[in-house]
């Protein structure tokens, strides 16, 4: 059972 990641992961630029 996979849980959708929300909010989506944010990568620092």
From Swiss-Prot:
Annotated Gene Ontology cellular components are:
extracellular region
The signal peptide stretch is none
Tell me which InterPro entries the record gives.
Tryptophillin
Q: Looking at the keywords, is Secreted present?
A: yes
GO terms under biological process: defense response
Query: What keywords does the record list, in alphabetical order?
Result: Amphibian defense peptide, Pyrrolidone carboxylic acid, Secreted
The reply to whether Transmembrane figures as a keyword in the UniProt entry is no
Family, as annotated? Belongs to the frog skin active peptide (FSAP) family. Tryptophillin subfamily.
Species of origin reads Pithecopus rohdei (Rohde's leaf frog)
Q: From the Swiss-Prot or TrEMBL record, give the protein name.
A: Tryptophyllin-13
According to its UniProt record, in which tissues is this protein expressed?
Expressed by the skin glands.
User: According to its UniProt record, where is this protein located?
Assistant: Secreted
Residues found modified as Pyrrolidone carboxylic acid:
1
């Amino acid at each position: 059972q996979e849980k959708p990641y929300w909010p989506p992961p944010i990568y620092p630029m």
